[in-house]
A protein has these predicted regions:
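Conserved N-terminal subdomain of the carbohydrate kinase-like
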Residues: 49-133, 304-311
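Short, conserved phosphate/pyrophosphate- and ester-handling motifs at nucleotide-, phospho-/glycolipid
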Residues: 43, 193, 255
Length: 313
């Protein structure tokens, strides 16, 4: 069965720091991460038909991802195994100022993915392709593959969704802004982050950020504001979506969850405002547990939160 949503990027095995035990030492919860993989799982949990495009190493981490996607209903038929390169790994640390990351991704299997590896038939058949700044920032071949995938989808009449997800350790702001701008000019849905816009564009005002990205051509821009909720912009108008107060312990992957849930609802026929309200609730619930994947909520949990907040349909 063809995937309606194809996500493309870098999966990474995750080790997430837990609160210190009685002896003061921290343990690390093994899990799975990578922004577009997180989004793929979030969309699949909301009922979308999802596939993934990447390369994994021929290693236990790669096997773990294949098992995860099988459990979550994410089609991995378009995932290559690269026997020469390993699957990436990262650590999440928690402190008084929030969470921080340490990545081991240099020369990973995903970073060596190139245009000839692309599954053209699957791309032509999908309704939406989702990718991110990380998808392109990990290497030049990966950036080229992303542009080639976008071209294949657009030629077939599909839509493109893009999350900026700027990581300064991957590339300098000027190059990141140039590459992302070229991709976003071909996108229909764009999900910038407040911190990304400040770092790459020098913009802090939410309306100025929406003005910038809508000016590049996308139909819908959703500015992710973290604890501040979200700000939706279209050619017709703008809507602020209030955050949900939750007992947050780990925001890792919350933005990815937002993107996946939003796209799942778009595929289900929702309008942009309804999809953004749903995704905002899903992202809030994700923050109530540790790890990028395990706390991603079910539709029942999301609708229950919306109902409690008086924001249900």
């Amino acid at each position: 069965m063809a995937a309606d949503l194809l996500c493309m990027g870098e999966p990474m095995l995750e080790f997430n720091q837990l609160p210190p035990g009685p002896d003061g030492r921290s343990l690390y919860l093994e899990g799975h991460g990578g922004d577009t993989s997180n989004a793929a799982i979030a969309a699949a949990r909301q009922g979308a038909r999802v596939g993934f495009i990447t390369a994994l190493g021929d290693d236990p981490a790669g096997a773990s991802f294949r098992a995860l996607w099988a459990r979550e209903g994410v089609d991995a038929a378009t995932v290559r195994t690269d026997p020469r390169h390993q699957t990436g790994v990262y650590f999440v640390f928690h402190g008084p100022d929030g969470h921080s990351f340490l990545h081991y991704r240099a020369n990973s299997a995903a970073a060596n993915y190139a245009p000839p590896d692309l599954p053209e038939a699957a791309l032509a058949a999908c309704r939406i392709l989702f990718l991110s700044g990380i998808s392109q920032g990990i290497s030049d071949p990966a950036a080229d593959a992303a542009f080639a995938a976008i071209a294949m989808v657009r030629r077939a009449g599909g839509l493109v969704a893009y999350d900026t997800n700027y990581r300064p350790r991957l590339w300098p702001p000027a190059r990141a802004a140039a590459v992302m701008t070229a991709a976003i000019r071909q996108a229909d849905f764009v999900f910038p982050g407040e911190e990304d816009a400040r770092a790459m564009l020098g913009l802090a005002d939410p309306d100025a950020i929406l003005d910038h990205y809508l000016g590049l051509g996308p139909k819908v821009v959703v500015l992710k504001l973290g604890a501040g909720g979200a700000y939706l912009g279209t050619r017709e108008g703008r809507v602020r979506i209030a955050a949900h107060p939750v007992a947050a312990v780990d925001a890792t992957g919350a933005g990815d969850c937002f993107c996946g849930a939003f796209l799942a609802r778009i595929l289900a026929g929702d309008g942009a405002e309804s999809a953004a309200a749903y995704a905002n609730a899903a992202a809030a619930l994700k923050c109530t547990g540790y790890g990028a994947v395990a706390p991603i909520p079910t539709p029942e949990a999301v609708r229950a939160l919306l109902a409690r907040a008086g924001r249900g349909p």
